[in-house]
C-alpha cells in the first residue's frame, strides 16, 4: 500500500494533457467494439496502462460476459489504485461498447470538431469519449504521481444493450466505492445524484 500523506488543500495541480485526451478519444473511436465485441478496446486500454507503468496486478477483467445473455468476448475492465492519502474510494467509469452503426468509424478532426470520414458510420463518442476521459485521468495520476484517495477505474461492457456489464459486475472487485462518476452523455451542466435503496 502506498504511504499515506496529508493532502495540502491549497496544492496547485498541473493542467491535464488535453491533447493526449483528444488523441485517446480519436484512437478509441476508431476501434470496432459493438456490444459483446469489446475485446480490442480492452486490449488498447490495457496496453496503454501497462506502457504507462500501471502494475499488471492492478489491471483486471471480470467474467461478467459469461453471465450475460448471449455472452460476449470479454468482461468488464477494472483498475484499482490504493490511495496516497485517506479518503473514501472513488469510482470513475465509462462503458466500452458502441452501437453497431459505429463499427468502422473513421474519426478525423475538422477545425475544432471531430467528424466521421465515413458518413455511413457514427463516431462512437458514446462512450469512447468517456473512456478517453477516464483513461487520461488515470494516466495523469500515475505519470505525474499525483496525490489521490483510493480509486477504482471501471470500463463496463454491453451498456448499450441493457447495462449488462454493470449489472453483472462483481461488486467486490470494485473495492466498495463511496462516490461514483460516470462519463456517459448528457449536458455538462447536468448532474444526476442518485442512491440505491
Describe the predicted segments one by one.
Residues 2-39:
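N-terminal capping segment at the start of a domain
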Residues 17-24, 37-45, 75, 88, ...:
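General structural feature for long, well-ordered alpha-helical segments within catalytic domains
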Residues 32, 49, 79, 92-95, ...:
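Buried hydrophobic positions in well-ordered alpha/beta secondary-structure cores of metabolic enzymes
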Residues 34-84:
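A non-catalytic alpha/beta surface segment that caps or lines the substrate-entry region
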Residues 36, 86-87, 99-101, 161, ...:
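Short, acidic Gly/Pro/Ser/Thr-rich loop/turn segments
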Residues 58-62, 92-94, 115-117, 153-155, ...:
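General beta-strand structural signal in soluble alpha/beta enzymes
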Residues 77-125:
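Catalytic-core environment of secreted peptidases
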Residues 119-197:
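Acidic/histidine-rich catalytic neighborhood of metal-dependent amide-processing enzymes
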Amino acid at each position: 500500500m502506498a504511504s499515506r500523506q496529508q493532502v495540502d488543500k491549497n496544492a496547485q495541480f498541473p493542467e491535464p494533457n488535453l491533447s493526449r485526451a483528444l488523441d485517446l478519444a480519436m484512437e478509441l473511436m476508431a476501434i470496432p467494439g459493438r456490444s459483446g465485441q469489446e475485446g480490442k478496446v480492452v486490449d488498447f486500454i490495457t496496453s496503454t496502462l501497462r506502457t504507462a507503468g500501471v502494475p499488471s496486478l492492478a489491471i483486471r477483467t471480470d467474467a461478467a460476459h459469461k453471465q450475460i445473455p448471449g455472452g460476449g468476448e470479454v468482461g468488464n475492465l477494472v483498475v484499482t489504485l490504493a490511495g496516497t492519502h485517506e479518503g473514501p474510494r472513488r469510482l470513475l467509469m465509462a462503458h466500452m461498447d458502441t452501437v453497431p452503426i459505429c463499427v468502422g468509424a473513421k474519426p478525423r478532426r475538422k477545425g475544432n470538431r471531430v467528424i466521421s470520414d465515413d458518413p455511413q458510420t457514427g463516431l462512437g463518442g458514446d462512450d469512447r469519449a468517456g473512456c478517453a476521459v477516464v483513461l487520461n485521468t488515470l494516466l495523469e495520476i500515475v505519470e505525474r504521481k499525483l496525490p489521490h484517495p483510493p480509486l477504482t477505474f471501471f470500463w463496463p461492457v454491453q451498456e448499450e444493450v441493457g447495462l449488462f456489464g454493470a449489472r453483472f459486475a462483481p461488486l467486490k472487485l470494485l473495492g466498495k466505492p463511496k462516490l461514483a462518476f460516470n462519463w456517459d452523455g448528457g449536458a455538462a451542466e447536468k448532474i444526476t445524484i442518485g442512491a440505491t435503496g
